[in-house]
Amino acid sequence: MRPIPTFLLALVAMIAATACAAEPTLLEADTRLARIAWRLTTANAALCRERQPVTGATLHAVDQYPAGAFGDTLPAAAVLVELVLPGTPADRAGLRENDGLLAVAGQPVPVAAAQGGITSTTRNAAQALIAGRPVDAPLPLTIRRGTASSVVTVQPVPGCRVEFEVMAGNKIGASSDGQVIQIGGRLFQLFDDDQVAVVVAHELGHVVLRHRARLEAAGATWGLLSEFGRNGRLFRQAETEADLMGAYLLRNAGYDPRSAITFWRTQGGKVDGGLFRSRTHPSSKARAEAIAAELATMPANAPTPYRPPLLARRDQPLP
């Protein structure tokens, strides 16, 4: 995966800032996002064309942080386990927070560049090594815990091939480029996990429906002119499709799909002017109505996971 400058800038700001008591820490937000992402990506693996092994562990790297961020503690490696979700394959295999990751299936994990500087390149390279492995084959990880090195074998499960990041600080936005989903840190202060899941499912809907590739194929442009004319219509169509697909993704993951309707009806005002402020996005009222109409078409006895007819649009050009 490629570095994302906006995330890096936000990360520096988060570490430098003094957070108010009500604001979740970066680790707390990362943990909440990891739980939501685990549910959505594993439950909807059958709907994702590109998949990867999912372990339930989140990685970070020393060069994502300013010098001295780890205090006097010497990190076990350049890439570390930030958190492990309970009950996941990583937890069952014995991975723990702060374990250093040295190799993936015998392939060495890159070492952080000596010249320093804030970058997610090292972390991304480690994630790419894992993502490139078979989705359901045993995954041997060479780790360092303290001064001892060992191999821990994780039995992953298939999940959608996409990574997740918290945009730390007061950002209320959310975005997806087809490879990485970024969720604004302020959402974790404003909303509970079920509500944040609506936003995450929407962004995952973009990935499932291949919106980045389809928008590029349609000749869409990003930037100041993206809101106008045919370009604006293309983006609005993609946003509506992601809303509808997101409701199905929620349902497949055990969330109440109607929570998406409730979110836009009751919380839309909190994000209007922030998360979905431009004319490339429908109004909150229109979003709620479209999702309600779509869910009314789902068969009462629909299987889980449900593959809605909407899924076929990922191979069709945007009109």
Protein language model regions, located:
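Post-HEXXH active-site segment of zinc metalloproteases
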Residues: 210-231
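Short pre-active-site segment immediately N-terminal to the catalytic Zn-binding motif
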Residues: 89, 184-198
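C-terminal capping/extension segments of zinc metalloprotease domains
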Residues: 20-62, 68-75, 127-135, 140, ...
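Bacterial N-terminal signal peptides
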Residues: 8-16
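Conserved PDZ fold ligand-binding element
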Residues: 90-118
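Mid-chain, structured segments of secreted extracytoplasmic proteins
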Residues: 62-100, 237
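Bacterial N-terminal signal peptides that target proteins for export
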Residues: 1-8
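N-terminal post-signal-peptidase region of extra-cytosolic proteins
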Residues: 80-88, 117-132, 137, 184-185
